Amino acid sequence: MYASRAYPHYLHLAVDFAGSHYSQMTPCENLRSDVEAALAANTELSTCAVQALLIYSIVLFSRDEIEDAHIAFGRCAEIALEIGMNRADFASSRHPENSVEAESLRRTWWELFVADVLMAIPLKTISFRCSAVSPEVPLPCEESLYTGNCELPEPRKVLEFKRRILLEEDVVFSSFSYRIEAATILGRVLVLNRLTDYHRDHLQAIENALVSWSNHLPMEKMEIVDPYGNMDEMMFQAHVIIAHASMLLHLPRSRFYPLLSSPQDDFMPYTHLHSSSASTRLVQSIKAMNASRRLSDYISLCPNIQKHTPFIIPALAMAGLTQLATSKNHSEECFDHHYNRVTLVLGCLKKMKRTWHLAEPAYHRVRSCAARLISDLMDKLNSEPLSKSAVLTQSTPRESEENNSPTGSRTSGCASSASARARPQFH
């Protein structure tokens, strides 16, 4: 394929380097040196250089080589902006007779946009490169169209997507479009968390955006798995990004934060803490808990964790930590619900760390936190009959009823009915 399409060798190497992490036969480190040397020797400013550097930077980030990843990504974004990939007509002018090639370039730009936000999560200072320019590039189409063998339709504009809220009927956009909006909201959360001072309205505006994202989803995009068991990976990632953004926003302002935060903790949200009332912290705790529960629900629907982007690793770690903190503030009746979700997260991280080193510290952080927070309660409940445990883990009537509602609005029986019982325990 590379020879027939005349792709440069450095792009071939970048793809091989990414794929080598899924194979036990290929020496990753040798390929890393090869692709690094090839990219360093390349002097052309081209879309292929952008694509190779984007792949390379994401792989480095997933290997927990954060500093090198940001250096590579910075060069990638610099080239993309210099050649004008952010312009509305860039892709179509490069490939006026080939809609698939033009779509590939639009997707490259928007993947840059999303990666720019996701790679900023562990940083203490943020300097977004791609979201600093006006959103001129048309939106990507649906995955099924892109991978098909037909001519692609005229791409839709970002303004069309934004104006959908003014229409009486739902207008369905591509799953990639909702993922882009999710990343935009996440970027707003990251910026807010790093402000030393802000008005309460700024926080409320982002809370409104998080809720509105779900409320404006058409029915076709509320679920991430269709009736035939096919998964929509773009919508899966979009839902995970929104859940992660919600945890990043609410957890630092909740009563859970003192239980989990520690110096130099890369997995907790970086923010300047502000004083708030006990009732406000309680509400923030419940919102963080619900976001972590939703994320674990998405993972349970799509359990083949190796098929998912390694960008979900920080979200998994935060979901596990939030569930652990919740278990300390809820009654023992709820413990099994939280324990099962923590077990799910640990299993996913354990499996992902075989491929991506970024999951290694995440796994050990959640595991060590679990050993500290719930080990004693596990010992206590282990002495009880198994039949009692089975009764406690049955769904409550509220849970059974709400599990039939759309994924985005489900609330577990523990998270709803038990939250009221647990409120006095938030002292």
Predicted features along the sequence, with ranges:
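Charge-rich, intrinsically disordered regulatory segments
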Residues: 1-9, 106, 116, 126-127, ...
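Hydrophobic, well-ordered secondary-structure elements that form the walls
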Residues: 247, 320, 349
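C-terminal hydrophobic structural anchor segments
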Residues: 282-332, 339
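Acidic, Ser/Thr-rich, low-complexity intrinsically disordered regions in fungal proteins
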Residues: 1-173, 194-201, 208-231, 250-275, ...
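C-terminal, low-complexity intrinsically disordered regions in eukaryotic proteins
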Residues: 258, 263, 268-283, 287, ...
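Solvent-exposed, amphipathic alpha-helical segments
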Residues: 178-192, 323-326
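Residue register of alpha-helical TPR repeats
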Residues: 14, 51, 111, 181, ...
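Amphipathic alpha-helix face/heptad-repeat signature
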Residues: 108, 178, 206, 236-243, ...
